[in-house]
Amino acid sequence: MSNLFTRRLALLADDAHRDLLNQGRRGIERETLRVDLQGKLALGPHPVALGSALTNPQITTDYSESLLEFITPAEHDVATALEELDRIHRFANAKLDHELLWSQSMPCTLPEEADIPIAWYGTSHIGMIKHVYRRGLALRYGKAMQCIAGLHYNYSLSEDLWRVIKQSEQSRLDDKSYQSESYISLIRNFQRYSWLLMYLFGASPALSTHFLRGREHELQTLSDDTLYLPYATSLRMSDLGYQNNAQAGLMPPYNDLESYMRSLSRAVRQAYPAYEAIGTRRNGEWIQLNTNLLQIENEYYATIRPKRVINSGERPVEALCARGVQYIEVRCMDIDPFEPLGISLPTSRFLDAFLLFCALDDSPLTDEANNRERTENFARTVKEGRRPGLLLQRDGAAVKLQDWGLELLERIQATADLLDAQRADSQHAQALAAQKEKLLDAGLTPSARVLAELQATDKSFEQFGLRQSIAHAEYFRARPLNAEENFYFETLAKTSIAEQEEMERTQSGDFDAFVEAYNQRTPQQLCD
C-alpha cells in the first residue's frame, strides 16, 4: 500500500472529513434495444408515449431509433439511482406495445444495414445535428456496431473532498485544476486495472452469427445462430465489438487534462482521406458533419471519459476547458443479462470501492510502453480472461490474472471498509467478497454463466436473449408504477414533446450555417 494511499485513507477516515464521502454522486445510463415478441429488432419510431428523444432527460435514444437509453439523475447513493432506473424500466415496459427490452449487450438479430433506423430528433438544428452525426457513424463504422448496448456508470467525488485532499498535500494548483488533474489520475489507474472489471463483469462471450455479416473472425461455432469464444468475457469490448481502423492510432494521453484535450481537439480538426472521399453531402442531403478523423469528440471510443455537464450547443472540450472535470463516465460495463436493470446493487457497490481506490492510490504518469501494456492486458482479458493460468503484463513482467486480481482486491478492501464505516454497514465488503469468489472460481463470472446457460439449453444466443427479455418484462410489469410515479413520467414525456415543438417553431437561421459554426467551435489553442 503506497504512502500516498495510506495518508489519504487516514485523512478521509477522520471524523471531521468522513461525511465528505457521502457527498459525491452516482448516475447510471442503461442502453437497450427494442425488440418484437420474436426477438427481432423493432423497426417502428421511438414511442410517442416515452416523450421526445431530444428533450426527455430520462428516456432518450442512442444511435438507433430502436436503441433506448435510460438515464438516472445523479444521486449521492447509488441505491437511489438504481431505484430510479427501476421506475424508468417499469414506465417504459408499460408503454411498449408488443415489444420487449433486449436483455443483452450484443444485438438481437438485425435486419439488413439499410433497414436499421437511425435515431431521429426532429427538425430543429440541434436535433438535425444529432441525426447527421449518426448518419456519419453509419458510414464510418456500419450500423450493426452502433446497435451494441452498454451500461455507463457516472461517478464523482465532492468538490469539498478534493479541496481537503489538496490542502493536506499543500498543492499549489487552484481548486479547479487540482480536481481536474485528480480525475485524470483516477483515469490512469482505471486504465491500468480495468481488465479486472472485464473479468468480473464481462457478460458477452457469445453473439449472433448475423452480427458479423461476413467479416473475418476467430470465433467458434456453438450452433447455427451462435458464435463464441470459450474463455471470452466481453466480445462487446473486443475488436469484434467497438472497433475502427481509423481510430487505431488515436490514443489521447492522460498525463494531464490539457494534453488530453489537445489530442481530441486535433482529431476533430484532422482531415481523414477516406472520409474526404465520401464528402459531407449526397444528393443535397447531409451525410456526416465533416470529413475529419472525428466528427465530434464523443466519437472517440473510450472505456472511460472525463466529463463536465455541457450547456446546450456546447462542445464537450469547451466545457472541460472552461470549467474543468466534474465527474468520470465508465463506459466498459456490459449489460448483465441476469439482472433486469442490467446491473445489480452489489456490482455498483464494488464499482464505488474500485473507483475510490483508483482516485486515492498513487497514479504514475504513463508512456507509450505503459499504454501498450494496458491495452494488451485489456484485449487479452476480454477474449480469453477465463483461460486457466492466463498471463498479463505488469511493468514488463508476466503475472497471472488471478494472482494480480487477488492482490488488487486486497488493496481495494481498504476503500470498501472506509465506505462501509461511513455507512455503518458491510455492503461494500460483501460486494468485494463476491468478486473474490469469481477470481477463485471462474465459473461464477457472468460470462461463464452465460455460456453455461447456452450449453444447458438450446445453445442459441438469440433464444437465451429472448427468454431473459421476456422474464425481465414480466418482472417489471408485475410491479406497475403508482399513480404519482406514473404522473411524473407522463408529465416528463408530454413536457419534452412540447419543448421539442417549441424549439422547432422558434429556431432561426440556416442549418448549413449552424453546422459550419459548430464545426469551427473547437478551439485551436485550449485553456490559454
From Swiss-Prot:
It catalyses: L-cysteine + L-glutamate + ATP = gamma-L-glutamyl-L-cysteine + ADP + phosphate + H(+). Keywords: ATP-binding, Glutathione biosynthesis, Ligase, Nucleotide-binding. Pathway: Sulfur metabolism; glutathione biosynthesis; glutathione from L-cysteine and L-glutamate: step 1/2. SUPFAM superfamilies: Glutamine synthetase/guanido kinase. Its EC number is 6.3.2.2. It comes from the Bacteria. It is an enzyme of class 6 (ligase). The keyword Ligase applies. InterPro entries: Gln_synth/guanido_kin_cat_dom, Glu_cys_ligase, Glut_cys_ligase. One of its GO terms (biological process) is glutathione biosynthetic process. One of its GO terms (molecular function) is metal ion binding. One of its GO terms (cellular component) is cytosol. Belongs to the glutamate--cysteine ligase type 1 family. Type 1 subfamily. PANTHER family: GLUTAMATE--CYSTEINE LIGASE. This is Glutamate--cysteine ligase. It comes from Janthinobacterium sp. (strain Marseille). The lineage of its organism: Bacteria, Pseudomonadati, Pseudomonadota, Betaproteobacteria, Burkholderiales.
